[in-house]
């Protein structure tokens, strides 16, 4: 893997990649918003905000692409103040004061409004940058991970709300001028925990609370189409649910035994189940088990092929949450479960079999497929403080179907503690997969090579230099934003 130099960033926003993949934004301690071209990594846009405000910033969010219009606005926000900056119209900016009602979260709508979540009340403020006005969406459910769902192709949003002791779905037509409530329907749920549109926009899945194993499927018109309950006895419900990229499968993650139920999306009947268990062995030629090994004296970490899964994991709890990620063409899926938090399971969805198991030394905190290459996945693990591996050895793990073995890659910078990773969208300018790796106060861009012998990065190349940044700031126009 080839690494670029280090570029300045701040915790907890780190670096933010635009949806179009053209820009990488980060913050500096001096109050600068630094925006680089993701291809050349040259500094193209610089905004100067109040340095004290920058130290409080917790959100750095690019506006999504609106049709043919590429993303050109970015939201920089703390819990009590929001700025919107524009890299095309440098003299434009917007600020929203929220100190009377601090934010618990913030996001963009598909039509370009800001959704501001209140810390004090169950409401969302929809803020229009065009009209410079905000309006409230009341009775929004709190403490729910998927409380709203944006339709993938039409300009409307579904909100999960609760009032008078009942769950409701609210369908809003969204535009740059206003959000109009089109329809409201009462749900049969006791306490719904999430909603999610299918990729084709025809179906809306509504998940019941974890004590009841049921999922309701609504048509886009708001009519209840199907109610799925497993045929076998399940003492508790589902911890999560996910659609595959093209909508072929709806996956339900059982909280009872960490089994994943895959439903086909014509009749919403069960197709097959993915079982997380320790009985698999690699005696089958199609099955591969790799375990991470550490060599302290050589300061290396590698994967070794093993005959069977370890059985010395801590005794799992009765209930286990699971997560699933599909690759971009729906041929493979990666899963983890809190039952065995050190293990990543890779499933071949074409023959409905387990293909590969990766056993890590530490708990997996993040895993994601490459957005354009269907056989490549990255894994990030939590490094324990009591680990004997030197502090410079913070690693990322990669698996690709075309490789002979999985790979362990360490950032060649002493003390670089990986906090966040993000794939770059495939680009016509680069045939190699590209990933942004963020540390606590800097980030680097890494390029994956097929042959590890072709990769070479000097440690001196990854030393962050304030002098280099100062020179870049001198040659790049800085736009000062009033505080």
UniProtKB/Swiss-Prot annotation:
UniProt KW keywords? WD repeat
PROSITE patterns reported in the protein's UniProt record:
WD_REPEATS_2 (PS50082), WD_REPEATS_REGION (PS50294)
User: Which Pfam family, just one, is annotated for this protein?
Assistant: WD40
TM ranges: none
Q: What is this protein called?
A: Uncharacterized WD repeat-containing protein C32H8.09
Name one process (GO BP) from the record. mitotic sister chromatid segregation
Q: Disulfide bonds, which pairs? A: none
Stretches forming WD repeats: 96-137
Q: Which GO terms describe its cellular component?
A: cytosol; microtubule organizing center; mitotic spindle; mitotic spindle pole body; MWP complex; nucleus
Stored Gene3D superfamilies:
YVTN repeat-like/Quinoprotein amine dehydrogenase
């Amino acid at each position: 893997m080839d690494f670029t130099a280090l570029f300045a960033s701040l915790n907890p926003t780190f670096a933010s990649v635009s949806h179009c993949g053209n820009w990488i934004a980060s913050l500096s301690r001096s109050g600068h918003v630094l925006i680089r071209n993701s291809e050349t990594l040259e500094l193209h846009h610089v905004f100067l905000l109040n340095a004290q405000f920058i130290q409080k910033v917790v959100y750095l969010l690019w506006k999504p692409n609106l049709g043919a219009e590429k993303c050109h606005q970015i939201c920089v926000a703390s819990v009590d103040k929001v700025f919107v900056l524009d890299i095309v119209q440098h003299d434009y900016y917007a600020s929203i004061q929220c100190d009377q009602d601090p934010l618990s979260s913030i996001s963009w709508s598909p039509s370009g409004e800001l959704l501001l979540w209140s810390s004090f009340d169950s409401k969302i403020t929809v803020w229009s940058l065009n009209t410079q006005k905000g309006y409230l969406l009341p009775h929004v459910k709190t403490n729910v991970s998927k409380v709203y769902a944006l339709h993938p192709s039409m300009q409307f949003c579904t909100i999960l709300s609760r009032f008078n002791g009942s769950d409701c779905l609210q369908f809003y037509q969204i535009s740059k001028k206003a959000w109009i409530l089109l329809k409201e329907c009462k749900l049969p749920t006791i306490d719904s925990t999430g909603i999610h549109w299918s990729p084709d926009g025809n179906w809306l899945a509504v998940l019941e609370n974890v004590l009841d194993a049921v999922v309701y499927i609504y048509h886009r018109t708001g009519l209840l189409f199907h109610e799925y309950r497993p045929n076998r006895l399940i003492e508790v419900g589902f911890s999560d649910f996910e659609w595959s990229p093209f909508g072929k499968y709806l996956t339900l993650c059982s909280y009872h035994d960490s089994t994943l139920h895959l439903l086909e999306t014509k009749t919403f009947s069960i197709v097959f189940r993915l079982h997380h268990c320790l009985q698999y062995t690699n005696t089958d030629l199609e099955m591969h088990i790799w375990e991470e090994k550490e060599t302290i004296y050589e300061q290396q970490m590698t994967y070794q092929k093993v005959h069977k899964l370890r059985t010395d994991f801590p005794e799992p709890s009765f209930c286990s949450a699971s997560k699933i990620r599909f690759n971009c063409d729906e041929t493979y899926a990666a899963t983890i479960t809190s039952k065995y938090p050190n293990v990543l399971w890779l499933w071949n969805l074409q023959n409905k079999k387990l293909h590969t198991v990766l056993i890590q030394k530490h708990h997996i905190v993040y895993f994601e497929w490459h957005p354009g290459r269907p056989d490549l996945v990255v894994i990030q693990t939590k490094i324990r403080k009591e680990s004997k591996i030197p502090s410079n050895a913070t690693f990322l793990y990669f698996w690709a179907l075309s490789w002979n073995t999985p790979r362990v890659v360490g950032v060649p910078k002493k003390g670089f503690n990986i906090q966040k990773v993000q794939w770059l969208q495939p680009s016509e300018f680069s045939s190699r997969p590209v990933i942004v790796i963020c540390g606590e106060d800097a980030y680097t861009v890494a390029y994956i090579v097929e042959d590890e012998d072709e990769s070479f990065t000097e440690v001196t190349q990854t030393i962050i230099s304030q002098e280099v940044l100062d020179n870049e700031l001198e040659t790049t126009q800085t736009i000062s934003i009033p505080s």
